[in-house]
Regions:
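Bacterial Sec-dependent N-terminal signal peptides
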Residues: 1-22
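Asp-box/BNR beta-propeller blade signature and adjacent active/binding-site loops
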Residues: 21-255
Length: 255
């Protein structure tokens, strides 16, 4: 009996695995569609069931810095097939990355929903940015037609970042001296109920001041909007040195 049970379980698990493998779709394939590598994916679903898959499209290599675009593919059949690749953000030969998309479903001006795509740009390698030899900025774009077209970019760096780079921009004059900066990885989120209903929240991380051993100059934080992107605010910094690659999910008690 035990042998029969083990055989059944093995057959069942193998069958499920093979069945799942048949449904696997490669959305982004390194070396195809103009990019050597794709990293940092994020996927969201629209109210109509369409899926939007974002990623960093790294043009020349798999490294974090360089000619990096934010690209998108859309599926209208629950992931069975995908559209051709669309470039949503192209920061010339520099880096645009860390896509954090979310659908705002609570704005009365957009009853069908409005997509926000938050992202970062950078002009140097992370190690150099940590030394103060470069800077990171925070932006967003929106779409009201399911990701087919996108708005102009909006720079929200002064609201959600604390850089000390007045030689770049007089407004980047914060004593906190945040340097490296990255959203997520993964999508942003919107609270669906409770006292924060409608709030859009983006998890992020940053480094503070000069580099420290074991990357203890890094800390997690978040930023949010309660008015559909008109203004943004910083959350408290998580006081855990070395915290990085932040993500967030709502809890049952509305936090």
């Amino acid at each position: 009996m035990l042998r029969k049970l083990l055989f059944f379980l093995t057959f069942f698990i193998t069958g499920v695995t093979l069945s799942a493998q048949k449904n696997v779709k490669s959305v982004f394939v390194s070396g195809e569609e103009g990019h050597k590598s794709y990293r940092i994916p994020a996927i969201i679903a629209l109210p109509n069931g369409h899926l939007l898959a974002f990623a960093e499209g790294r043009v020349n290599h798999a490294g974090d810095f360089g000619d990096v675009n934010i690209v998108l593919k859309i599926s209208k059949d629950k992931g069975a097939t995908w559209s051709k690749l669309q470039t949503v953000v192209d920061y010339d030969k520099l880096q645009a990355g860390n896509p954090a998309p979310v659908v705002d479903l609570t704005d009365p001006e957009y009853p069908k929903g409005r997509i926000f795509l938050f992202y970062n740009t950078g002009n140097n390698h992370e190690g150099e940015v940590r030394k103060g030899n470069g800077y990171r900025e925070v932006w967003y774009k929106t779409s009201v037609d399911g990701g087919n077209t996108w708005s102009d970019e909006v720079n929200i760096t002064t609201q959600v970042h604390r850089p000390y780079q007045p030689q770049i921009n007089p407004a980047y004059n914060f004593k906190e001296d945040w340097r490296s900066y990255a959203n997520t990885p993964g999508h942003a989120m919107q609270f669906e109920s409770g006292k924060y209903k409608g709030r859009i929240f983006v998890a992020a991380n940053h480094s503070e001041g000069n580099p420290k051993p074991q990357f203890t100059d890094y800390f997690a934080h978040g930023f949010y909007t309660d008015d559909h992107g008109k203004t943004f605010h910083l959350s408290q910094t998580v006081n855990i040195p070395g915290s990085n690659e932040s993500t967030a999910a709502p809890l049952a008690d509305d936090r």
